[in-house]
Each structure stands twice: as structure tokens, then as C-alpha cells.
Amino acid sequence: MPYVDRQNRICGFLDIEENENSGKFLRRYFILDTQANCLLWYMDNPQNLAIGAGAVGSLQLTYISKVSIATPKQKPKTPFCFVINALSQRYFLQANDQKDLKDWVEALNQASKITVPKAGNLPLTTEVLKSLATPLALEKKPQVAYKTEIIGGVVVHTPINQNGGDGQEVGEPGSHAILRRSQSYIPTTGCRGPTGPPLIKSGYCVKQGNVRKSWKRRFFALDDFTICYFKCEQDREPLRTIFLKDVLKTHECLVKSGDLLMRDNLFEIITSSRTFYVQADSPEDMHSWIKEIGAAVQALKCHPREMSFSRSISLTRPGSSSLSGGPNSILCRGRAPGEERKTLCKAPSLASSWQPWTPVPQAGEKLLPTEETAEDSLFTPRLGESSTSAVLPSSRIRHRSEPQHPKEKPFVFNLDDENIRTSDV
């Protein structure tokens, strides 16, 4: 239902059909400002929006000719609906209940009435104009960005120097703050680095603070293990991280009191140490957050080891020698442990540069020149043993890098034998 704020404006939530005859109503926050002679509607309460965020729609009160309850013929399937006739356009709005509908219709009709001021009210009008000029002068005061921290249980505001690193002069006007904030909402690929776990869901929501109970818009990101919220989408470091293992329950907040009464699409994340109150932009978004968080918590409880293994693969840097270092890791899973250990211990760079030990021949000793073929193995039989004979289990096989033992006869075969094979020479 509508209420009057500190600036004597009528405020509240309504559903508006922005495109006539579309049948789609969107939730908006309306402000009826009789002093500014206009009706404004925002995406949310301006206190929750970013600095400099303007209204998504406006309507001058002088253009309103009539405000009445919509007939069943106009909107048969929309209860508590009323219509604003302004110039040649009609605005259909939907209230929460019958009392809300009646209050809004009376307030809009009262504000759109054309009144002729009396002669005795001219000085009063001048005073009103002066009082209106005073807040406008105060609003022109430059706003300073600050960072809120809790040090020793005390809230400390630290001013932030926004000129640092931008190449701007100190004497430039302070309008760059709004420009920087508008640039910060340019969509990007995400707030996480390329090595982080993939995001399940992300988006902006309004969160209640723990100390001052203030509501601020934050960028939430949900992955397989945590719920993080950032000041904006481009931030790398989160303001806080909620581990899914600590989440006890996530559901829609139905029991409201105090400041929570005016909060729609509100759900709570209950942990062992704190309850987080989060407001989504729409009921669909709220139910989507509740569903995704609940599914992630359930998946973490059912398969904690598989989730941790998948995260270790995603966090491994490319080119590393771990199991997830390359495409060969999939082939190594089916090997024996000994073979896998050999593959990991022997680096490719060392294998290409490894050279066998070459002995220095003794004086007066001749080495038999041999031709290496593709069939030569790494280990060769000792001198004096035939290549065709079977190798005894107790005999030691000589490595090609081991020097040959000196023998009396330099040649094993008789070169004058006619039955000798050419391959034995």
C-alpha cells in the first residue's frame, strides 16, 4: 500500500503495463511528487539503486485527465487494475489489493486537479518556491565516494580517491563519478578469472547489511562451492564469500516485520552464523535463486569428492605436469601405477638431450665397427655370445653404452668359413 516518505511524497510498488495491450505487467516503484508535478517510476526503491540511476518512466500530472478503476471489459483477467488517461495514451496499473487500489486512485485524482490559487496565497507560493530551491542547491553539492569498513566494531568511512590512475587533472569537475559508475555497469564476461570454477548463476540483487541494516545493490555469483557478492560486476575480489557447506536452508521470506515489510521478492539464506536477507528483482528471479542454491548445496552434500576433483581440474594452470595438465592425462588414467610414475618423472626435455656414456677405448685395442639397424635393441649380448642363442636367465645383458670386454680373438667367427652367413660378419 502507498505510504508518505520524509519528503511528503506518496510512494509504493505497482505493476504497470508499459506497452499498451501487451498484457505484460512489470513491477515498478512509483513516486507521486506533487511539488515537482510529476509521477515517476523506478526499477526499485531509489535508495537501493546506484548513485545517478534515473527513473525508467515519468508522467506530468498536468497531462492526466482522469484516473479511474478499469472495467472488466478493459482488463478482464487483471484484478485491482486502474487506468490513467493522459493525452492520447492510457496507462494500466495493478495494485496489490482493494485498499491499495482505492488509495492510489484518490491520490492521483487529488494531485492532478487543477486549482486556481487565491490572491492571499501569493506570498505562500513564493515561500514554497524558496523551500524548493533550497534542496536543489543542496543536491548540487558534490558527492564523495567512500568505502565502509568495520574496525573494532565501529563503522569507519574511508574516502576513495577516484582520480588515481585515470590521467585526469585534480581541477576537473566532479561529474566523473557518475560517468565512472555508468561505465562500471557495462556487461562483461564475468567477475571471475578464467581459472575459477564456472558460474551457475549470477546477477544483481539487493542485500541487507549486518551492522547498519542498510540495503545495497550487489552483484551475486553462485558456483559449485560458494556464493560471493561483489560491489559491481567488474570487481575481482568479493565483499564476502558464503560457503555452501555452511548453508543450512534457503527459502522465501514469508514472515516479515519492520523494514522487511516493504520488501518484495525477498528470500533468506540461513547459515550457521548469520541469516542473509536478499531481495530479487522479480518473483521469477527469486525462485530461480532459491532453486539453484538449493541444488548446488544438495550436489555438494551428495558428491563432495567429485566436485572437488572437478574444481582441481578447472583450477590447474595450462602446461602443468599434474593429471589435468594436458590431453594425455586421460590416457594415463588406465595405466599401471608404475608406468604412470615413469611418465611423470621423465620430462620430455630431458629425454631428447640424454646421451649414453661413451667409453674411452684402451691403447692397442680395436673396436669392431658395426652397422646399426632399425632392429638393434637397447641391450645387446656380450661379446662371444651368438645373437641366435638363447640368453640364460643368470647372464647379464650388456648395455650399448658399456664397453666391450677385451678378448683374445677380436672376431668371434672364422672369416674363411664358407658356411658363415653374411649377416654374422
UniProtKB/Swiss-Prot annotation:
Domain of life: Eukaryota
PH domain sequence ranges: 7-113, 198-298
GO molecular function, one term: phosphatidylinositol-3,4-bisphosphate binding
Compartments reported by the entry: Cytoplasm; Cell membrane; Nucleus
UniProtKB keywords: Cell membrane, Cytoplasm, Isopeptide bond, Lipid-binding, Membrane, Nucleus, Phosphoprotein, Repeat, Ubl conjugation
Bias kind Basic and acidic residues: ranges: 400-410
Linked residues for Glycyl lysine isopeptide (Lys-Gly) (interchain with G-Cter in SUMO2): 141
Ligase among keywords: no
Region called Disordered, residue ranges: 374-410
Main location: cytoplasm
Gene Ontology BP annotations: positive regulation of cell-matrix adhesion
Protein's membrane topology: Peripheral membrane protein
Residue list for modification Phosphoserine: 184, 314, 349
Gene Ontology CC entries for this record: cytoplasm; nucleus; plasma membrane; protein-containing complex
Protein function: Binds specifically to phosphatidylinositol 3,4-diphosphate (PtdIns3,4P2), but not to other phosphoinositides. May recruit other proteins to the plasma membrane.
Quaternary structure note: Binds MPDZ and PTPN13.
Name of the featured protein: Pleckstrin homology domain-containing family A member 2
Source species: Bos taurus
